[in-house]
Structures are given as C-alpha cells and as structure tokens.
Regions:
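N-terminal cap/lid segment of alpha/beta-hydrolase-fold proteins
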Residues: 1-19
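Alpha/beta-hydrolase-fold enzymes
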Residues: 104-191
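Short alpha-helix in the alpha/beta-hydrolase fold that links the catalytic acid
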Residues: 213, 227-237
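Active-site glycine-rich loops that stabilize anionic/oxyanionic intermediates
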Residues: 24, 31-35, 221
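Catalytic active-site module of serine/aspartate enzymes centered on a nucleophile-bearing elbow/loop
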Residues: 245-285
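Alpha/beta-hydrolase active-site loop
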Residues: 74-95
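Conserved alpha/beta-hydrolase
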Residues: 37-70
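Short beta-strand/loop motif that positions the catalytic acidic residue
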Residues: 211, 217-219, 223
Length: 285
C-alpha cells in the first residue's frame, strides 16, 4: 500500500507499507542516502513474512519523494534527520499505535536518528552500516573515489546543472547541491557532524546523549565507508539508557565473500537478515 505524509514544513514524503498478516510490531525502514527504496523491498518482505509490518519510505528529493526539480534546491543533508525522520516516526506510530515501533536504519537512516526530536518514541533501533563517513578512515582506493566525487564531480555538476547528476554516472540517485556540499564537509572531519567546526550551524545534538531505547549495530569488515574506525567515531558520541550492542561480520564468512556498504540487504547475505530478525524478536521479548 502506497502512503503519503507531510513533514512539519509541508513537504510531502512518500513510501509504502508492507503489511504482516498478524503484526507483532512496526518497523520503520530508513534507507541510505540517495538509494532507491526498491533496493530494500526483498528485505522488507522478509520482515513482513515474519510478523513485522514495515514502513519503507524515502527522504525529500529522492525516489518517490522527489516531487520537484532538484535544480537550485535548498534541501540540506541534515533535513533527513531534522525534518523527514520525525515525520516518518509520527506516521509509523499511527499504523498500529498499540504495538512497539522499531527502526532499521541504513547508513544515514540510522546516523541521523538523533536529529529527530521524537526519536525516543522508538522502542529499538537497528543500525546497519551506521557510522561517520570520514574520508581519512576509508580504504585508499575508495577514499580517492570519494574525494573525486565530493571535491570535483559534485561542485562541477552543481555549477553546470544546478544539482549533482550522480545517477547518469551510475553512482547513486541525483543529489541536491546543498545536500552534497554539506555531506562532503561532514565527511572531511573525523567527528563528522559532531565536530566543533560545525558548532554554530549543526543541528541540535542533545538527543544523541539521551536515547531511551536499545540499539544494535551491524557492520562488516569490508564496508568501505563504515569501517571500524568510522563506526567507533560515531558511536563514541552516543549514549542510551538501554544497551548499545555491536556485531562485526567477516566478509569471508559470507556466501559471496562480500558485504560492502550495501550487501547487508542482498538476499545472498540472508544470514544477516536472520540476525536482524532475531534482534527484533529480542526487542519484543
């Protein structure tokens, strides 16, 4: 079932509900930045088949929520957490108000949870590849590609076209110019948006120290972005009254010997899906 809901500033966000026959909880599935929701559908159906109604959606300017031209758009990276995720949490709460609400956040979808003023309405968070994106802690080959994208391709494309034409390069979905610039600036700092460099402009960070729900973080050792260093750099700033647990996968243990930053959601790594399901069940226990 397709859904539409509005952020506090009136921007319409779109998504879909993958309903469980007899739901025991609702899962808000937050995608990574500039990633089509269709990529997550097999995983969402897996959760629904095991009793979790899933709300899969996308951020302003991306996928089904790209409702206007990105040329000259004023969308910022922090809008994901400040404006869009709060609206998604509120919408998800209406689906089955009597049931627990969990979030599975991929990359920025978990990283920016603490920007949401209502994040403590969640009953649990599973963060998949949730870390900083610091260039300096990426493998050298990937680091060079990231620098090339953010420091060359992105500004040139923004100057020529008014937005970042990333989709034509088969990199990701197109990016609003301000979002790409802010994202790149964060990635240039080891502490990401926690850096004092952004103290006058960054969103309110207090919620990151007052989580009131359990957290499980899943990361693979071949993830080019969520490296061990980048993962620790983010989570050292985050506090919860409930446990924050980590599981580190060895890519060599996976059927195709690969996970990377996106492979967690590929059916070939269904072992990870089962671990997510087991953790959701423990949240519910």
């Amino acid at each position: 079932m397709n859904i539409a809901f509005a952020a506090a500033d009136g921007v319409t966000l779109n998504g879909q509900i993958i309903a469980a026959k007899q739901p025991k909880a609702v899962v808000l599935l937050n995608p990574g930045t500039a990633t089509k929701t269709s990529f997550y559908l097999p995983f969402a159906h897996f959760l629904a088949e095991h009793g979790y109604t899933v709300m899969l959606w996308n951020y302003r300017g991306f996928g089904e929520s790209r409702t206007r031209s990105l040329k000259g758009s004023d969308i910022c990276f922090a809008d994901i957490g400040q404006k869009d995720i709060p609206a998604a949490i509120a919408k998800a709460k209406t689906l089955h108000p009597q049931l627990p609400l969990y979030c599975v956040g991929h990359s920025a979808g978990g990283q920016q949870i603490g920007f949401a003023h209502n994040c403590n309405e969640l009953d649990g968070l599973i963060g998949i590849a949730v870390s900083t994106g610091y260039f300096g802690s990426m493998p050298m080959g990937y680091r060079i590609k990231a620098h090339l994208f953010f420091k060359v391709i992105s500004p040139i494309s923004s100057a020529l076209f008014g937005y970042v034409k990333a989709e034509k390069l088969n990199l990701m979905e197109d990016l609003p110019p301000k979002l790409a610039k802010e994202w790149g600036r964060w990635c240039a700092n080891k502490d990401f948006f926690f850096s004092e460099k952004f103290s006058k402009e960054k969103p309110e960070l207090a919620c990151y120290r007052t989580f009131n729900f359990p957290v499980q973080v899943f990361t693979a050792d071949d993830d080019e972005i969520s490296t061990v260093s980048n993962t620790k750099s983010l989570w050292k700033h985050i506090k919860s009254t409930k446990p924050i647990e980590f599981k580190w996968y060895k890519a060599s243990d996976m059927p195709k010997k690969s996970v990377g930053h996106f492979g967690y959601f590929r059916k070939s790594n269904e072992l990870i899906w089962q671990d997510v399901l087991d953790r959701l069940n423990r949240f519910s226990a």
